[in-house]
Amino acid sequence: MSNVKRKDSKNRNLRNGESQRKDGRYVYKYTDIYGKPQFIYSWKLVPTDKTPAGKRDDISLREKEAQIKKDLNDGIDTVGGKMTVCQLYEKKNSQRKNIKRATEKGRQYLMNALKNDPLGMRAIDTVKQSDAKEWAIRMSEKGYAYTTIDNYKRSLKASFYMAIQDDCIRKNPFEFKLSDVLEDDTEHKVILTPEQEERLLAFMEKDKIYSKYYDEVVLLLETGLRISEFCGLTTHIDMQNKILNIDHQLLKDSEIGYYIETPKTKNGKRELPLTERAYQAIQRILKNRGKAQPLIVGGYSNFLFLNREGLPKVAGNYEGMVRGLIKKYNKYHTDKLPNITPHSFRHTYCTVSYTHLRAHETDQ
């Protein structure tokens, strides 16, 4: 009896591990790399079979068997390959918990985007490069910026790389250039020329509204601080040695309010010598500083820059101020200035510093 071959409804011999259910669907039973039984299904035994009417089309059982046998021979985790993209991304994130709040929020945004997209529920071993590209196109159609999509793609590429290292899949579907799929419409960094910088400052110095921000913009241009580092400055400044100690950022979140973060990079903690122009600006800022509300954030108090309520200013305050400043300047001048953000002052500072460094090296 043991030599009797099992047959399907079409009188075809079935191989070891193969069977056919009463509803006509074929089943293949195998043992995964962990020694646990697994099952795969298909309405077709071989590629030439037709899928029954009303049933979802799929590759045949024999094709699935061949792939599984190849995966098992190569040590591929066929079960791990069935985790969804959302599960993979969550697993990747679970391996690095000590992150900044902004990074945590960024992870939440991407996870929500995945949950609201067909890609998120796909098994990772079914995701092809064409699927990843279609995801990028859908994200663009939903209104996501190119840089955001590129950042999300980078995170997913890292997640799929982990899956490759864990022998769950063979290839990384996110191994492609986004610019081959979407047009890079990212606006280039705006850098003020020395002449534009002087025109802007001259306008601010005389303007009734924006003159009160003059010293703050001078300090941004002279130090190149990130705006969150700038907002984190306190009145405890080493004026005797003319040094700014940068060791934290001040940010504000709609959920938790003000909070302190370490600098963005490992080299972010630094001592910054003050130029004479910056030193004079700080002296005026300290002299004209209004009354502060009693507030301690992460052990820091006496923040240097205050809003009209006596609370620390944050990035949003300066973003709005700069927009209004440029709009008003361009309204009364034919020689228009480009639209800038507070971060543009940092770009300008870095460019000027690099130019001076190159000039010094040439002289040497």
List where the protein language model places each region.
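C-terminal catalytic core of Y-nucleophile DNA break-rejoin enzymes
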Residues: 40, 260-284, 300-324, 341
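Short beta-strand/loop motif that positions the catalytic acidic residue
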Residues: 352
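Basic, Lys/Arg- and aromatic-enriched nucleic-acid-binding interface segment
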Residues: 152, 165, 169-171, 175-227, ...
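Short N-terminal "domain-start" leader segments
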Residues: 2-23
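Conserved tyrosine-mediated DNA breakage-rejoining catalytic core shared by Y-recombinases
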Residues: 232-290
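N-terminal core-binding DNA-recognition domain of tyrosine site-specific recombinases/integrases
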Residues: 53-57, 93-168, 186, 208-209, ...
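Conserved small/polar residues in nucleotide/adenosyl-binding loops
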Residues: 355-364
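N-terminal DNA-binding module of tyrosine recombinases/phage integrases
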Residues: 21-26, 32-133, 287-299
